[in-house]
Amino acid sequence: MTTTQRTQTPSLDYWIHDADQHYYEPDDCYSRHIEERFKKKTMWIDRSNPDTPGRMYVGDERCQFFSVGAGDNIGAPGMMKAFLQGATEEGGSPSLNPINGLSVPEFVDAKARLARMDEQRVESSLMLPTTGVGIEPQLRAPKHREALYPSVRAFNRWLEEDWGYGQDGRIFGAPMLTLVDLDEAVVELERLIKAGARFLVLTTGPVDGRAPGDPYFDPFWSRVEEAGLNIVFHIGNTPFGEMYSKPWGLRPAPPSHRHSLMEYFLAFTERPVMDTVVSLIADNLFGRFPKLRVLSIEYGSGW
């Protein structure tokens, strides 16, 4: 028996909806709209050495999840095949012969992305953070916490300005929020609802010793349900390293591309979302708010 190798990209007779697209954020995604006194307390990128990728900081501390600018040094489209075949740089990164994502128009510009979506027959896309999924847990630390909500608000205003929340019916930017301070969270939630947000990204895991489905947070969940927002849990930085990796003698906050096997298992992929979803169910969140919708994205499905 012989097989015929496909020489063309398979085509569909309909356009698709893509629920996991990303942009690469500009350096000022946190600082553009933040109050002046927080500009050096939020996420910023040191580009004093033009010969190396930018070094990411949260305040005066190196960013834990991304050591360099998230878009500075990435694998080119199609590199995952080489990664799976072992054709990678030392250390196993899929970034062999990397490119700068910030230099690719459709990675950073909504109009260019729409043109690419038209070319690829993508009707609409859920547009998610890249840098954004790695910052919030570090900002929870006591030394950074005063900049947490100013940073979240500033990021959301940048997103609203550069990508939008889906008013065009095609690119649905998903703002971020944190439940660390319930009152602050509800205030920003109301602003996002008025601005037209349809999706909302939260970090998996507990919040300062409370389960996210604790009735304490019901004022937040009630408004989310009433407004019809969709909650998104996307793989990224979480509190799980501190909770589970550290007691095993492992690093609580390794860089995203340098997890050991055990760190990966305990704190990075399926464990955070599995524990979070089980917690929401066990706390009867969906019994109290049956119209809530939650998306688990890039967290696997083996669980």
Model regions and ranges:
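Helix-coil boundary/capping segments in enzymes
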Residues: 1-303
